[in-house]
Structures are given as C-alpha cells and as structure tokens.
C-alpha cells in the first residue's frame, strides 16, 4: 500500500509550509507558503546567505534612507526566496504582506502591489503568486480590491466563521483557516484533551469547507497550522492543506490506509446576505478565541519581521 502522503495527494492538493528549499525538494508539493516567521528561520540557513546579500545590495540602490533600505531589503528577500522556491514547485508561492499593516487597507494594497511588481521584475508572473494578508476586516477589503486587479490573495490567521464568510463574499482566491492554534487555545482554556474528531480546529475547518461548498463559493479552503497528523487525516479531502516538513515526513513514513473525510456537496443553495462590517466586528468580539489568536498571530509575525529587519539592518 502507498504511504499516507501519496494517498492524501489523490484528493487534496499538498502545500509545503516552509521556506526551506531542501524540504521542498524532498516532498514535491504543488505549492509553498511562507510567512515572516518562516522567512526569519530561512534567513538563518547558511545556503540562504547569498539571498540576504543580494537583497541588501539591491536595497542600497533604491534609497539613501536606512529605514527605507531595511523595508526594501525585507520585501526583496521575500521575493528572492519565493522565486527560488518556484523553481521546485509547479504551482504557487504565498508571500506575506508586513503584519504591521494588518489594520491599514491602503498600506496593504500598496505593499501587495509592490511585491507583485518585484516578482514580475524577477520574471515571475502574478498567476504564480498569492499575496498573504491577515483576515482582519481591512485585510479582507484590501484583498477584495486586489482580486479585481488580478492579484490573487491568501487570507491567513483565520480562526472564525465570520472571517471565512467575509472572505468568501469578498471573492478572495484562498483562505488559510488555522487548526492547531485553535486547538492550543481550547486546551489551555478548558484543560481538556481532544481526539482528532473532536479537535475544535478540525471542527472549524470542516464547518467552513461545508459552508463554502453548500453555497457554491469558489474560494479555496486550505487548512493550516497542524499539531499532529490526526488533524490532517480528519481533513483529508479539503481543497488544500499546507503542512510543515516534519508532518509531511510523518505522513510519508505511515503506510496505513487513509480515508477521505471531506467531500463537496452537490446540493448547492443560494448564498445568504453579505456580512456587514458591524456584524463582522461584533462576531469577532463575541469569539474570544478568534480575537485572541488573531491578535497574537499578528503580534508574533510582526515581532519576527522586526527580528529579520535587525539582521538586514546590521548588513546595511
């Protein structure tokens, strides 16, 4: 019998959640996703040193202002790494907008357009890139405009049904609902242990997947942030799953049978009325888990972005 990774690839598109090109070569995913934390990790890999040098050298030609050079070097590094990864994946790379812009729609638009321009200058067409932004109201509204410009988006740090509903209605290309971080919150909050079936993160993604299929939304559901392969197995059949190299390795070594869990319905119903900004904000406020995890996720990505920038600043 084939291993669970091979079986999973039969009904779910596998995405590698890493900036490590060696890992990508090992697992042959369709796509890859990066974020500020993964970029920070990648920057510490010795083989990536030339990419940092290249980004810094380029930034020096763009501005005489040190602070601007740091920002430019960060953008360029993300694009250099993304371009390199695209040599090994047939699909797309997800590159994240600076998390510090999560509540600024116009700044998110400007940063996204800049990243796409840098990719296009590097010979990478926009149809191979997904721009990642946090699923704040402002991030979702920015994505709605970007989609109209032919810039596809991946809305991340998604923890609630309200976020998923708003993303679908905005026509975003793809969402990344988090699984493991939801489980973390509930375990800490309730003190309970959960099985793969009762895992609140699995339940959340299953509900979102079924809702999207039931209403005919085209937005791709890509489960993210996994703590164990049990969560992945429960979401077998999801449109895409983005998985870290260590869990991809576990799936590859497991020769057991994998059963498909998620299937699209054929009974499509009309979509409900669109969620308003007030209703979105209220739903988020009512959901302590989603509010806390979204805030924490943005803070952590911003902190890692600052650490990466300190490294780049020291090179300027």
Swiss-Prot record:
It is found in: Cytoplasm. This is Transaldolase. The active site is at 132 (schiff-base intermediate with substrate). Coiled coil: none annotated. NCBIfam families: PRK12346.1, talAB. Homodimer. The gene is tal. Pathway: Carbohydrate degradation; pentose phosphate pathway; D-glyceraldehyde 3-phosphate and beta-D-fructose 6-phosphate from D-ribose 5-phosphate and D-xylulose 5-phosphate (non-oxidative stage): step 2/3.
């Amino acid at each position: 019998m084939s291993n669970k990774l091979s079986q999973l690839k039969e009904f779910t598109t596998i995405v590698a959640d890493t900036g490590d090109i060696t890992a990508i070569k090992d697992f042959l995913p369709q796509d890859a996703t990066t974020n500020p934390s993964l970029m920070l990790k990648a920057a510490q890999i010795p083989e990536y040193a030339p990419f940092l040098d290249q980004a810094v050298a380029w930034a020096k030609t763009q501005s005489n202002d040190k602070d601007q050079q740091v920002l430019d070097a960060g953008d360029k590094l993300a694009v250099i790494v993304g371009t390199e990864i695209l040599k090994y994946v047939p699909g797309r790379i997800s590159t994240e907008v600076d998390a510090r812009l999560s509540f600024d729609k116009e700044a998110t638009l400007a940063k996204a357009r800049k990243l796409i321009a840098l990719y296009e200058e590097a010979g990478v067409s926009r149809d191979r890139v997904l721009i990642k932004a946090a699923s704040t109201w402002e991030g979702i509204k920015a994505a709605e405009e970007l989609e109209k410009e032919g810039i596809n988006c991946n809305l991340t740090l998604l923890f609630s049904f309200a976020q998923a509903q708003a993303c679908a209605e905005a026509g975003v290309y793809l969402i990344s609902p988090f699984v493991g971080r939801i489980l973390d919150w509930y375990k800490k909050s309730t003190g309970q242990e959960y099985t793969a079936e009762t895992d609140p993160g699995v339940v959340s993604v299953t509900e979102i997947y079924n809702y999207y299929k039931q209403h005919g939304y085209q937005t791709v559901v890509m489960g993210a942030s996994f703590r164990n392969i049990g969560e992945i197995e429960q979401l077998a059949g999801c449109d895409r799953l983005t998985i870290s190299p260590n869990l991809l390795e576990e799936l590859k070594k497991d020769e057991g049978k994998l059963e498909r869990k998620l299937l699209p319905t054929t009974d499509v119903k009309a979509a409900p009325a669109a969620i308003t900004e007030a209703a979105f904000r209220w739903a988020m406020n009512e959901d302590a888990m989603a509010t806390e995890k979204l805030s924490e996720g943005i803070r952590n990505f911003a902190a890692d972005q600052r650490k990466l920038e300190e490294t780049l600043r020291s090179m300027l």
